[in-house]
């Protein structure tokens, strides 16, 4: 079981790092070209094999297909990113937990909690990401770190605690605000790529928590 779990954790970390990259910064021309490659389309097809993710993967693929016909695709998609995630007006979907859970304030209690968690686990945020620590990209990256770090554990009791920590992080730091974030993305993202990504992130996180909770029961 341990070897199977290590493979699963590597796959989970890969998906979390990928999701983090979508909300980290605007996609470049090279990034967009990669999304049209057979390698990435195979990766997305693999995700779609999971029934709970298939609908949201389909919406993301449809948006990527529309992107191929979009005039000035990179510039327009960068504008979508800016309008959704970098503006502070009412027609945006700011990717910070504090906005949704701390009276709409930036850099609130969730950011402080994330700073403490990152410090406790020795995780450093990329220097060029000048954002509060409760940014979605940072939270997803941290979850990937937790998943891959669990592979260093050999004892089942410690492993169960590590899996529980991941489940608790999802409950306490992501599911408290991600549904509202995904809803706002859907409301304000006319083209639909980032709203599809947000809904897919939510669906994957919900499914991952369910999977973690089952694994915790098995390791007891």
Swiss-Prot record:
Places the protein is found: Cytoplasm
Signal peptide: none
SUPFAM superfamilies (alphabetical): TorD-like (SSF89155)
GO cellular component assignments: cytoplasm
Highest taxon above the source species: Bacteria
One GO process term, biological-process aspect: protein complex oligomerization
Primary localization class, coarse: cytoplasm
Record's keyword annotation contains Ubl conjugation: no
Assigned keywords, A-Z: Chaperone, Cytoplasm
Keyword Phosphoprotein: no
Pfam families the record matches: Nitrate_red_del
NCBIfam families named in the record: PRK04976.1
Family under the similarity heading: Belongs to the TorD/DmsD family. TorD subfamily.
Function (record text): Involved in the biogenesis of TorA. Acts on TorA before the insertion of the molybdenum cofactor and, as a result, probably favors a conformation of the apoenzyme that is competent for acquiring the cofactor.
Protein name: Chaperone protein TorD
Organism of origin: Vibrio cholerae serotype O1 (strain ATCC 39541 / Classical Ogawa 395 / O395)
């Amino acid at each position: 079981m341990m070897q199977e779990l290590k493979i699963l954790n590597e796959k989970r970390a890969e998906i979390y790092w990928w999701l983090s990259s979508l909300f980290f910064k605007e996609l470049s021309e090279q990034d967009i070209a990669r999304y049209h490659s057979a390698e990435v389309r195979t990766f997305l097809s693999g995700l779609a094999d999971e029934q709970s993710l298939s609908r949201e993967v389909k919406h993301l693929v449809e948006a990527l297909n529309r992107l191929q016909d979009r005039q000035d695709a990179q510039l327009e998609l960068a504008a979508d990113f800016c309008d959704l995630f970098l503006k502070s007006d009412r027609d945006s979907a700011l990717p910070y937990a504090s906005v949704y859970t701390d009276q709409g304030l930036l850099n609130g209690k969730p950011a402080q909690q994330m700073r403490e968690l990152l410090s406790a686990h020795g995780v450093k945020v990329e220097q060029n990401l000048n954002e509060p620590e409760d940014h979605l990209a940072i939270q997803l990256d941290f979850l990937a770190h937790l998943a891959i770090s669990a592979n260093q554990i050999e004892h089942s009791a410690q492993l169960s605690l590590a899996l529980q920590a991941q489940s608790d992080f999802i409950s306490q730091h992501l599911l408290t605000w991600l549904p509202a974030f995904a809803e706002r993305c859907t409301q304000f993202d006319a083209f639909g790529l980032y709203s599809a990504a947000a809904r897919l992130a939510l669906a994957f996180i919900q499914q991952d928590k369910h999977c973690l909770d089952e694994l915790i029961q098995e390791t007891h």
